Curated annotation (Swiss-Prot):
Regions of compositional bias (Basic and acidic residues) in chain numbering: 110-121
Name of protein: Protein cubitus interruptus
PANTHER family: TRANSCRIPTIONAL ACTIVATOR CUBITUS INTERRUPTUS
Chain intervals with Polar residues compositional bias: 323-332
SUPFAM superfamilies in alphabetical order: beta-beta-alpha zinc fingers (SSF57667)
Chief localisation class: nucleus
Keyword vocabulary terms for this entry: Developmental protein, DNA-binding, Metal-binding, Nucleus, Repeat, Segmentation polarity protein, Zinc, Zinc-finger
GO biological process terms held by the UniProt record: segment polarity determination
Amino acid sequence: FEGCFKAYSRLENLKTHLRSHTGEKPYTCEYPGCSKAFSNASDRAKHQNRTHSNEKPYICKAPGCTKRYTDPSSLRKHVKTVHGAEFYANKKHKGLPLDDVNSRLQRDNSQGRHNLQEHNIDSSPCSEDSHIGKILGTSSPSIKSESDISSSNHQLVNGVRASDGLLTYSPDDLAENLHLDDGWNCDDDVDVADLPIVLRAMVNIGSGNASASAIGGAVLARQRFRSRLQTKGINSSTIMLCNIPESNRTIGISELNQRITELKMEPCTAGDIKIPMSTNTAIEVFPEDLLQNHTTFRNTVLNKQGISTVSGSVQGQFRRDSQNSTASTYYGSMQSRRSSQSSQVSSIPTMRPIPSCTTTAASFYDPISPGCSRRSSQMSNGVNCYAFTSTSGLPIINKDLNA
């Protein structure tokens, strides 16, 4: 300003000085009903504290000094004149903030923080969980896992409730209340076969490939289960494993069943089995030879080797259907295998073929259906037949004289 030669180190001080030349007073009194305005905040604070209240919030921070002032300008003047410019330059003379709404809240917070410091409790929000974890962690290791859960329920509210709650409980009480249960003793490997049928079905559904690995998985699981029983000193033969269905108990019967199914699906007439024989030499076969060869043939079927060509001089051509074939008769009785496996095994040697006639011509009929008659086919084709009759279940050839 023209005619003024004052200099200031801070821009704010220069602006405040310029207001004295311009007459600008942007700081008005905040007290209700008071309309006084001031050019700087220091003068306004001095007015409010002196006129509208008797507080002196600005305290000298010098050691041993108890002076209090209503405005910061009076405090600065006191520090410069009494304690020296060096003490003022270190900014150790700053007092408390103004006596407004924000300053009151800040003073309340500082007072509550001071009370917490007297109890050796850190009131910062970041250290609430860690401090509770430290207190709980000194009781026992099992409480450490519960400290994170309990800290969320005991958060500090202005630093008062948390201190009261922690002082009412001792570490021993926390250890008794927050003691964890003992861990369950679980087996490392749980076999699917050991589970009940309902749970095992659910496991198979969830796996997605239960149909492909049901038989192999059940066998392996059953072997592991029996080996574990033997290591524990338990006789597995005396234990009834009724809940574990054995889908492959008799391997020979299953393989024989599979072999018969393959023979049925071969490119023959609807599953009929043919053994090539010569019609010229079939008449010359003796009943004893045919009896021996047929016995060998039936034993071969039961020994899981399939049905092969009869050795020896039997080369006549005949056909076996579901009524005169041991293998086909067994296949017909295989339908009752699901209900009883023991009756399936016992029914093999007691079955006897029923006399019927076979033809050399191919006919499309169901070999399993017992109601099919071969006599109509015999009459239509007009071919000679050989009757196989036996009381012991073995066929004997009778020569047809009409041939």
